[in-house]
């Protein structure tokens, strides 16, 4: 009962806040003479034709966003881990490269970085728009992920390395079997925040005419004059993505914690 009451209270608060938001939006729309057309929104998600269901513009954009985010996330984690290890290394050159990369990326806007990659570096190295978007997102989010992982590495006691070495483990297996599980457990919540940021930042690549969820939403609005319905739908889809990711992270954190405690 002690656990159920806070959950019910939180659900009640969420329902009340949602009801208040709906009332405010409806009142504002009526004051402007706006006519809601929610019945048209499903046609831009799925449509039925020739006996089959087909993905409409919003669903097509969502699939592009998911593809873009998934590939960018892979490179983000690889780049973040590599940079974190470089900043922890004994090599002066390695530390300088890692520090310089993080400093440059974190102190310049993502939009400017996208323009530089798209208009300057992309044509030089022959990248298409999608690859440029993946590179821009991975470079940007990788710098922040590197700091998260570096903080996690700093929190692992030096004795863990020494104990693994005394058991005869190589450097690779020391990191893979001893350090990495602890690093994941320590950094999973902040890493989830970085993943959520990656999903949200993926909307910025719409400036490159990539047909992601945001671009498709903008195109639909220009064709239908339904700004409220479409943008609220787009926002709801992004919210569903980020909340699902947060829930998955909480489940993984619980499983990893239980597994670590059992050992």
Model features per residue range: what roles?
Residues 1-263:
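Transmembrane alpha-helices and adjacent helix-loop boundaries
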